[in-house]
């Protein structure tokens, strides 16, 4: 089985967040201009549910698809009722950006992470947080039910499959897991393989773990980003994922992308296929042959790599596993006749037999 591009939908601005909806073919997308969209991929149309005052970094569906929650660089959570299409609540939850927003698998919780990289000493290590870096909210009551500390900036967050544990990771490669029921730190771990110290041009730290997710059984964590660089502005660190076994006395790395399978570039999103046998990683490519790839979950080997010449920010499989949804952006280019191009993208891949290819005429919408 292979994956082929089925459809490419142009959006007005870069798409930063993505969520599927239960019992619906529609998708939720959050955008660079602050807008929250409900997209109908069949018709390539959308409606605007709400608007943030800065980049809308994430959007999720909760409460069995009856509500959408969005977060942005304005540090605000917005709650959108999908039946009426109206924004029903707005709350300032962070003094800085919401880097990432995730919903628990049971649809009852949402978690947002924040944190600003400020110099904390002579070695330019990050300063300690000024506010709790992780906040968890009840989807029904919209009230905060937990908050946890971490070293900022905290870039990524994930719930375990049973919705009991919460993991978060930062720029320095620190991963922490909390037990939400007991409100305690379960484990912590560090990997140096995602963080750069600038030797050329800029002397500071950069990079980090841009996404993480639990395995379907919950025993492992996958984390992704890119490898260290001498020039932090180059964006050419090695495409990287690692697998962590976190439940033991001492968390340990038990898997990693093979050198022969990877190129260079920032990897920003991970998604597990519903059958648990495959996972996807995507981002942007600086050098190599792919920016979207499917990996065998057991062996960790590359199954298929694809280059769609897009910076991918979020990914999600359809519930039945026959489609892979990707959001991101193309190069914006120069304005033509006073108008900027539609540089946001929603890409839909579908599974096809290995000897069958999607007709080129059906692969994109005006690309």
Residue ranges and their predicted role:
Residues 1-367:
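WD40-repeat beta-propeller superdomains and closely related acidic/aromatic-rich repeat-like regions
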